[in-house]
């Protein structure tokens, strides 16, 4: 009994010397550790976001087969951009980003962008295009985007200046050919007739698919065309060489080519917002702003939701392949572990100038992260 009392006295003495225990200190330390963990997660996500933006810039140039971003200023874009109905419809109405994630899928498509529409502007005329010492409009050069795809539709768009009184307009589209023995330099393509009323000018489209297909088969036969739109008094109403106040009224070709459908496979994933404390693999929002890059050569969209993946990957969590966990169990030291990566991506539609100042409307694959997983 006496021995027990001695032990109790010693214990009380130790408590007095050590002083009171501050339980709040442990909770404060725990809170600091949690805050530090959250801070590290935020920093990691910010670094991942920055890397994703840089990767997107590189991917876009690579997928569009551009070595560098086209050097086209905002003012130049305003001058080159046709004020024509088909282009305005693309800018105002087309779906800049597909939201119809029909099947969760990782696109099984080619790496490069798929062209759907090309707006070809007239190129500068050369000596072959000059008749009687005068340049004629118009001569069009065609990129590989048209040459190696099936042409579905080809429309020549011309702008007719306004008239003061009702009149009938005779449109002539003439194809320039090599001089024949009798001196003939032209052959007719189309000669539509239309009625115009006083008011604003109008855009008129003419089907030139057959002519374009012939040019693609025999490029040497492409010497250009001449455009005329004569009213009843013989005045030419067609804008071929725009004057003051006629920017964006140049003739142009609208060419539509085929697009190949892609196969898909299913997958699943989880989403989080930027304020989430979740440390596991998730998809986070990311908006890419092309104007912030100074990429004025991209006509539309000016920005799009790209998203990115970030987070830790525990084994058997959102794994893309079921055998990943088995491989790690068989050889835990030889496996680096799964990584948080996109498992479903979708394309975006883009309207842009290429290096030849042609306007392209096409689809760029795998630019939007729809789902994330561990693989």
From Swiss-Prot:
It is found in: Secreted. Residues 19-266 form a propeptide. It holds the Pfam family TGFb_propeptide. Synthesized as large precursor molecule that undergoes proteolytic cleavage to generate an N-terminal propeptide and a disulfide linked C-terminal dimer, which is the biologically active molecule. The circulating form consists of a latent complex of the C-terminal dimer and other proteins, including its propeptide, which maintain the C-terminal dimer in a latent, inactive state. Ligand activation requires additional cleavage of the prodomain by a tolloid-like metalloproteinase. Keywords: Cleavage on pair of basic residues, Cytokine, Disulfide bond, Glycoprotein, Growth factor, Heparin-binding, Secreted, Signal. The keyword Disulfide bond applies. CDD domains: TGF_beta_GDF8. Residues 1-18 form the signal peptide. SMART domains: TGFB (SM00204). Homodimer; disulfide-linked. Interacts with WFIKKN2, leading to inhibit its activity. Interacts with FSTL3. Acts specifically as a negative regulator of skeletal muscle growth. This is Growth/differentiation factor 8. The gene is MSTN.
């Amino acid at each position: 009994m006496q021995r027990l009392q001695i032990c109790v006295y010693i214990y009380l003495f130790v408590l007095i010397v050590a002083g009171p225990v501050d339980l709040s200190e442990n909770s404060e330390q725990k809170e600091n550790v949690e805050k530090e963990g959250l801070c590290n997660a935020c920093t990691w996500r910010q670094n991942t976001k920055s890397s994703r933006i840089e990767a997107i810039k590189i991917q876009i140039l690579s997928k569009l087969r551009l070595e560098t971003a086209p050097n086209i200023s905002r003012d130049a874009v305003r001058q080159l951009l046709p004020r024509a109905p088909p282009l305005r419809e693309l800018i105002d109405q087309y779906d800049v980003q597909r939201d119809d994630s029909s099947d969760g899928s990782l696109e099984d498509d080619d790496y490069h962008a798929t062209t759907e529409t090309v707006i070809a502007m007239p190129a500068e005329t050369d000596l072959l295009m000059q008749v009687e010492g005068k340049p004629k409009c118009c001569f069009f050069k065609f990129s590989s985007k048209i040459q190696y795809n099936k042409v579905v539709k080809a429309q020549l768009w011309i702008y007719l200046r306004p008239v003061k009184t009702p009149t009938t307009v005779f449109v002539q589209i003439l194809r320039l050919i090599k001089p024949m023995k009798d001196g003939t330099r032209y052959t007719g393509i189309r000669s539509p007739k239309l009625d115009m009323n006083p008011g604003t000018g109008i855009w008129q489209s003419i089907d030139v698919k057959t002519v374009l297909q012939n040019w693609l088969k025999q490029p040497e036969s492409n010497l250009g065309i001449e455009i005329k739109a004569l009213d009843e008094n013989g005045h030419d109403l067609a804008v071929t060489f725009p004057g003051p106040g006629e920017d964006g009224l140049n003739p142009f070709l609208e060419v539509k080519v085929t697009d190949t459908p892609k196969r898909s496979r299913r997958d699943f994933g989880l989403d989080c917002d930027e304020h989430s404390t979740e440390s596991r693999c998730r998809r986070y929002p990311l908006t890419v702003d092309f104007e912030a890059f100074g990429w004025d050569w991209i006509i539309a969209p000016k920005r799009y939701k790209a998203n990115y993946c970030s987070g830790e990957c525990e084994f058997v969590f959102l794994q893309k392949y079921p055998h990943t966990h088995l491989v790690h169990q068989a050889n835990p030291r030889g496996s680096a572990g799964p990584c948080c990566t996109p498992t479903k991506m979708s394309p975006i539609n883009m309207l842009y100038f290429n290096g030849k100042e042609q306007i392209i409307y096409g689809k760029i694959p795998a630019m939007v992260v729809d789902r994330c997983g561990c693989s």
